[in-house]
Swiss-Prot record:
It comes from Francisella tularensis subsp. holarctica (strain LVS). The active site is at residue 191. Keywords: Cytoplasm, Lipid biosynthesis, Lipid metabolism, NAD, NADP, Nucleotide-binding, Oxidoreductase, Phospholipid biosynthesis, Phospholipid metabolism. It catalyses: sn-glycerol 3-phosphate + NAD(+) = dihydroxyacetone phosphate + NADH + H(+); sn-glycerol 3-phosphate + NADP(+) = dihydroxyacetone phosphate + NADPH + H(+). This is Glycerol-3-phosphate dehydrogenase [NAD(P)+]. Its EC number is 1.1.1.94. Transmembrane segments: none annotated. Belongs to the NAD-dependent glycerol-3-phosphate dehydrogenase family. Pfam families: NAD_Gly3P_dh_C, NAD_Gly3P_dh_N. It is an enzyme of class 1 (oxidoreductase). GO terms for cellular component: cytosol. The keyword Cytoplasm applies.
């Protein structure tokens, strides 16, 4: 099945997914919210700003400027903006989306103003539009270079999830499906916060024992929040949670981990953000998850500790001491 796909968001991840769709045989148009970035992609037929390893776009992938005026051309819209821009993008789509069109989200995080799940935002604004989430352990550069990658497509509508699965999957990119859109979102969002925590620990040279403990207890915190919201327990040992958590906490391709690493090495927050020189989702998501967990009365010690380091200037060494000397308890 050949489809016409609009990709909104031309960062590394949005571009990698646009490339995957083009390699799959679809006609793809990609848009950046920055006019000068669109002009560069149109002129050079690449996105060297975010994916310098890709010399030229394949023939089926091109940049587009005025996507609203051309919305009728597309079957599906892939939203790959930072979480901070997700709500505004959905509001823009509300003004022009057609009844037969559907949305795929590749954005991870929570809504920055209401701390709601992104699927809730989409359903509230576009209640009759089919919505799916694509998430899992996937670095953009590796996907763009067609290295083997596996992800999850989550939707309340299993038939729509299967449609998206077929849209993307080929010999390099394998999509699984699930109807647990809550669990998939919680895993994909919270892991970015924990990747910062892992980076801080690495920067302070706390060792691999601490790294293993952090991932394991971090997974327990994600699961606790997810179950409170109605997620399925099995989701948390799958690609959208454990898989993504392992990847993001363990490799310096992760912007979130690198940001934490710089903090652990003594940089200020502003210095670390400047050094990463790209969106650090976990920095913004930490505040959202903190407020979200407090709202739902869910205790998340590692997430709360990371929030205090990022937003209350807490000393990481003091935080570690507090975490290690909390009241002793049963693991489960």
């Amino acid at each position: 099945m050949q489809k016409n796909i609009l990709v909104l968001g031309a960062g590394a991840w949005g571009t990698a997914l646009a490339l995957q769709l083009a390699y799959r045989g679809h006609n793809v148009r990609i848009n950046s919210w920055k006019a000068e970035h669109n002009e560069q992609m149109l002129k050079d037929n690449n996105n060297h700003k975010y994916l310098p390893s890709i010399e030229k776009f394949p023939s089926r992938l091109k940049a587009i400027q005025d996507w609203q005026a051309n919305i009728i051309e597309f079957d599906s819209i892939l939203v790959a903006t930072p979480s901070s821009g997700f709500k505004n993008t959905i509001l823009e789509l509300k003004e022009c989306i057609l009844p037969q069109q559907n949305i795929i989200s590749a954005t991870k995080g929570f809504c920055h103003d209401s701390y709601a799940l992104l699927s809730e935002i989409a359903e509230d604004i576009l209640p009759t539009t089919k919505f799916a989430l694509l998430t899992g352990p996937s670095f953009a550069k590796e996907l763009a270079n067609q290295l083997p990658t596996a992800v999850v497509v989550a939707s309340k509508d299993i038939n729509y999830a299967r449609y998206v699965q077929e849209l993307f999957s080929n010999e390099n990119f394998r999509c699984y499906t699930t109807t647990d859109i809550i669990g998939a979102q919680v895993g994909g969002a919270v892991k970015n916060v924990l990747a910062i925590t892992a980076g801080i620990a690495a920067g302070m040279e706390f060792g691999v024992n601490a790294h293993a403990a952090l991932i394991t207890r971090g997974l327990a915190e994600i699961k606790k929040l997810g179950l409170k919201l109605g997620a399925n327990s099995e989701t948390f040992i799958g690609l959208s949670c454990l898989g993504d958590l392992l990847l993001t906490c363990s490799d310096n391709q992760s912007r979130n981990r690198r940001f934490g690493l710089y903090l652990g090495q003594g940089m200020t927050i502003q210095q670390a953000l400047k050094e990463v020189n790209n969106v650090v989702e976990g920095y913004f998501t930490a505040k959202a998850v903190y407020n979200f967990a407090k709202k739902h009365n869910v205790e998340m010690p590692l997430v709360f500790a990371t929030y205090r380091i990022l937003y209350e200037a807490a000393d990481p060494r003091d935080i570690v001491k507090e975490l290690m000397t909390r009241q002793l308890k049963n693991e489960n």
